[in-house]
Amino acid sequence: MNLKRRLSVSNDIELTPMMKQFLDLKAKHPDAVMLFRCGDFYETYSTDAIIAAEILGITLTKRANGKGKTVEMAGFPHHALDTYLPKLIRAGKRVAICDQLEDPKTTKKLVKRGITELVTPGVSINDNVLNYKENNFLAAVHFGKSACGIAFLDISTGEFLTAEGPFDYVDKLLNNFAPKEILFERGKRGMFEGNFGSKFFTFELDDWVFTESSSREKLLKHFETKNLKGFGVEHLKNGIIASGAILQYLDMTEHTQVGHITSLARIEEDKYVRLDKFTVRSLELIGSMNDGGSSLLHVIDKTISPMGARLLKRWMVFPLKDEKPINDRLNVVEYFFRKPDFRELIEDELHRIGDLERIISKVAVGRVSPREVVQLKVALQAIEPIKEACQQADNPSLNRIGEQLNLCISIRDRIEKEINNDPPLLINKGGVIKDGVDTELDELRQIAYSGKDYLLKIQQRESELTGIPSLKIAYNSVFGYYIEVRNVHKDKVPQEWIRKQTLVNAERYITQELKEYEEKILGAEDKILVLETRLYTELVQALSEFIPAIQINANQIARIDCLLSFANVAKENNYIRPVIEDNDVLDIRQGRHPVIEKQLPIGEKYIANDVLLDNATQQVIIITGPNMAGKSALLRQTALITLLAQIGSFVPAESAHIGLVDKIFTRVGASDNISVGESTFMVEMNEASDILNNISSRSLVLFDELGRGTSTYDGISIAWAIVEYIHEHPKAKARTLFATHYHELNEMEKSFKRIKNYNVSVKEVDNKVIFLRKLERGGSEHSFGIHVAKMAGMPKSIVKRANEILKQLESDNRQQGISGKPLAEVSENRGGMQLSFFQLDDPILCQIRDEILHLDVNNLTPIEALNKLNDIKKIVRGK
């Protein structure tokens, strides 16, 4: 049943005027929960009320809706909006905020209302909705004929980015930017979910939004330019369409004050290392795959400002692949590392800056509070010593940052002059503008505040004149200021006083003098609020002229913050500066896993390892060794050290020469994708296929236990073929680490000159395994899986039986040899490996065995067979 039918079941019953108003406004955004301002409350009705009550945990009640009818209602006080709105947004709801557009006191008719904002998961500037360490991106995807266009906008910071390319590139961007909401053309859901999955919050828009003409027109109008060449996106037809769709959506959601969106930047694919979503997830760059686990971001994020935290997260998934910008970052990190006084100065000032980026965005949209304006002033004051220190530093990169920082002295000093240092949160509370800023405001304050002092003087004077010591002057909203006299003294009241109210123990009076002062005082307070609001608005308008400069400041501060974080992490964890080289050599000495080493018990030292890969002598390393020995950790630490180096960080090692990597691929672990009909093995093969189709000579490839999802011989065959393909590839000889339990792959070293065998060593003492976690030359013969099973608490009978089977298998293999034998021949030789049903010495099983052995199957009728089955069933039940 639609909303209108729910509100009025029959056409004969008329809705109340307010409900008609609600329905008219609701029709503009039928899919959104509407918060309808009614006096001091925001109310929701009908299905919206049911949804709100469930999500917010508020009472569901009813409101009158015409003659004899009611409608569901749930509401909350208007001042609690910041508490309840985030809960609705986090629940994936779009919320239309409908406010009263006029003062109810000034009209006798229905109060005029309108939708002032549509808040969605991807479009919000509410601090309680936003995470200060994360961007809140809105994305739009356009499916073009030859490419897919994509755009990202964070309205809370003003960042606006676009790109286009094949589906896999767009998929990578979606996973790396992690938008909170994605827009696409109506009717394209199947195409979207088929390529990018169904995990995102999405919203469909009409097809006219995704046309080149409307999008280009919207962008040109917004940026006030004749073309888009200056942004470097003119050739991105599909990216332009996606970008224009985002601006159209801002109009639809009543976000029209967007002066802080000052540019549209192209995401330059060629500048960054390719990391697909599998790599980001399996390396646990941003979050852990396990509850309670840690991530690389958690270890290296020592940022101070919210802008720095957001930028660091971006750097993590967009490592650089050019030598100069990487070394520029490393040079700054080293300067911080070696100059503790400089580091301390910058740290102290960063603590004063706050979220400069989001504050200046609020200036543009007209939502900045007086306290945030003061914080902006404090930030600009803190930037001055940072600018001076950077300009004086013996480092060209810091010098350039210092040059770009703008002190915005005129607006900074104006804020200092005009705004109180500790203003209220809201302008309508008064006390925002300093004394001495405006003559009229000072005069009004004199009347308002000295007028109240004068009332006290009247009270003292009248008390003395009348001889009434308990006389007092007070105020209420019904008849304003009054004199209250207790009944015991009412005979002393002068005749000119006018009685207004009689109480049980007292009477209240007014005088002509009181009324005159009341008008002056109350009139002054109203005028003060109007004047303060006007002066504050003028200041904010002046501040909006500095948006571009302050955005540059925020970007540079974020950059400094990230590099300072790298230096502090390096100092704390004993990292060293990597050597970045434009070659194919990856030489890590005594490398450590940055996350695991932080999780070790106190006093336990991480076992460091060397890794050397190049395209000439040691291109592929095959790593064998027991379960739990540390093969997976070694693979991941190699990738993490490489990635840390290419985002400009020091690394956990004694030395590291990093030949630049253009792509990092990982095939580590697997999980079923049953929802789309894909098994573990299918997922594994899809990921491996993607890697092999995209590798280059500068790629770093990590395979861990490839082929586990199928039979042993299928797995060995596939693993062998993949390693051989990577080694023999005519152009893309990718540096590869291949961890496996297939010891047969150790034979490859004899036939392929750039494949080398290594193992993660263990020691066996008294039938117990000690994991040494050290990478050594040569292959391993054993996996020690049964030892691990024993450590996991497997029943002793199973461990014993497993050892028996293992000995038999090893004996068979020694006698016959598996290598080189056809799969069918080996399969025939598996007799005796399966547990015999009749070897179990259970009396019930023995009885069942006897029953079955004595059956004459050839002469057994169906009825007799069923009866015999019933007898066996009784034996099992013990009857």
UniProtKB/Swiss-Prot annotation:
Alphabetical UniProt keywords: ATP-binding, DNA damage, DNA repair, DNA-binding, Nucleotide-binding
Protein name: DNA mismatch repair protein MutS
Protein's job: This protein is involved in the repair of mismatches in DNA. It is possible that it carries out the mismatch recognition step. This protein has a weak ATPase activity.
A Gene Ontology BP annotation from the UniProt entry: mismatch repair
Gene name, Swiss-Prot/TrEMBL: mutS
PANTHER family: DNA MISMATCH REPAIR PROTEIN MSH1, MITOCHONDRIAL (PTHR11361:SF34), DNA MISMATCH REPAIR PROTEIN MUTS FAMILY MEMBER (PTHR11361)
Ligand binding (ATP): 625-632
The organism of origin for this protein: Bacteroides fragilis (strain ATCC 25285 / DSM 2151 / CCUG 4856 / JCM 11019 / LMG 10263 / NCTC 9343 / Onslow / VPI 2553 / EN-2)
One Pfam family cited in the UniProt record for this chain: MutS_V
GO cellular component: cytosol
SMART domains: MUTSac, MUTSd
Superkingdom, taxonomy of origin: Bacteria
